[in-house]
Amino acid sequence: LNDKELLIATDGGGVHKINVDTYQITPEIVADYNSNNGMNGNSINDIFVDDEERVWLANYPIGITIQNNRYTSYKWIKHSIGNKQSLINDQVNAIIEDREGDLWFATNNGISFFNSKTGQWRSVLSAFEESQGNKSHIFLTICEVAPGIIWAGGYSSGAYQIDKKTFSVSYFMPPLYTHTNKRPDKYIRDIRTDMQGYIWSGGFYNLKRINLKTQEVRFYDGLNSITAIVEKDEKSMWIGSATGLCLLD
């Protein structure tokens, strides 16, 4: 939110704010079911704050809720049946902004793209686009790994790569690019890039560091059931898993 405050998304408790100096936690955005224009859900999968200080919330399972801090008002974005100019699915798991200021949403039925300049929507990898050949349409994480190159991961063994210019889709499964007998992941829960340009991918069986240019893949043994990846500094990464939190040097 700023240098002193962080927003924390919860599953059932809405959004809380923590002061990084005092560690004081206070409710920030909580459902108000008695108001027609209040917050409408407490299960928040992801948070994004834009340049206008609007808070975009992946409000599971009812779409996107946008809170405007300047006017304390809310706006709702939902899927409209048969309308291609809408969010592809209301069950949103992740939100990112790319280098050009446009937004991408990972959902339980494909990926939605929102052009912030024109207000136009596009979607890929959903059940409505059978020509793209993917059998799984649930995506849990999304990341811009290079300018205009988007990776999306979910309930599949690898990542789908989307070229923003052409909206063409390709598939990348790391074990195929190594000479090891590492088994493919059951799912990809988080994809991140670090300061050096490496791509980090965390799944059910392993943590991987990928060089996009050379397609070299390094596996980190002993780390599995990955849920979150955050870069601490140039030499270390925080790795969250189903069993705890690790600091990787």
Per-segment meaning from a language model:
Residues 1-249:
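Carboxylate-rich, polar loop motifs that coordinate divalent cations or form catalytic acidic clusters
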